[in-house]
Each structure stands twice: as C-alpha cells, then as structure tokens.
Amino acid sequence: MALSLDILMSVTMVTAVLTTVNAEYKDSRLDSRQLPANFPMCQHRQLCAVASRATNNLRVYCRCSDDTICPISDDHHAIYPNTAYICQHVNSYLDPCVDITIPAIVTTSEIYVINCRCDTYQWPPVGGKVYCESLSSRMFKLF
C-alpha cells in the first residue's frame, strides 16, 4: 500500500512539474511525450537546457524538434559539460569566439542564446552574460 501511494505521489508531482513552460530533469532520459503540447520550439542558437543553480537539475527551456527535447546525453551538444546544451552539434554549428571581452552567451529572461564557442566559460552568467574564460585553441574541439 505504501509503495502504490509513493508511485501515485511521484506521478502527481511529475505531472505538475511538466505542466510549466520549462521543466527540470535529474537525468538524461528525456522523451518528448513527457512535455506539454505547448512546449516551445528552440529559437536560433538558443540553449535548450541549462543547469539550475538552485537545484543542479537541468532546466529544459525548449524542444529541438517534435521528436527531440534536448540531447543532454550527448557531449557533442554540450556548451559546458553538465551545465548547458544546444540542439545542434557544437563544433560544426558554432564558430569559435575570437575575443574574451565579447559575450559568448547572452541571457534575457529565461532564454540563453549562444554567439560563439569557447574552450572554457566563466560560468554562471553574470549580468545576463557569459564570457570565455579561455578561447577555443583549435578549430574543432574533441570531447
């Protein structure tokens, strides 16, 4: 009886979380069927998931396609490991940053947009901006 009550409570809590516009996940097993029908599609260069500073859970902000939420289990989509992800393959989609004084990532409200890729980032964002800690030393970074 206690086990079935735990299952019922878990289902209820998951349903409540997933009815918000963005949702938090503790692992990489994301399925587009978990999302509400009105969950937004990602915009150009928008980060699809970013780790919450409060909980360390990934907060998913948008879906990459009708069938894909956000490829958080693939390092080739990681802007910053275990912290930020983009729908596209990082190395083939983003140019390397060339100046550490220009923001690599800009955030407004709850939308993170990446302009270029760095080797390492000054994370978390300060004042809505993330700068490179070190510039990309090679054209294609291998994970």
UniProtKB/Swiss-Prot annotation:
Which tissues carry this protein? Answer: Expressed by the venom duct.
* An MF annotation (GO) of this entry: toxin activity
What's in the keyword line of the UniProt record?
A: Disulfide bond, Neurotoxin, Secreted, Signal, Toxin
| Sections of the chain in a coiled coil | none
Identify the stretch annotated as signal peptide in this record: 1-23
- Which coarse location class describes where this protein primarily resides? secreted
Processing and modification events after translation:
Contains 4 disulfide bonds.
Which residues form the propeptide in this entry? 24-32
The domain comment in this protein's record states: The cysteine framework is VIII (C-C-C-C-C-C-C-C-C-C).
Name this protein carries in UniProt: Turripeptide VIII-01
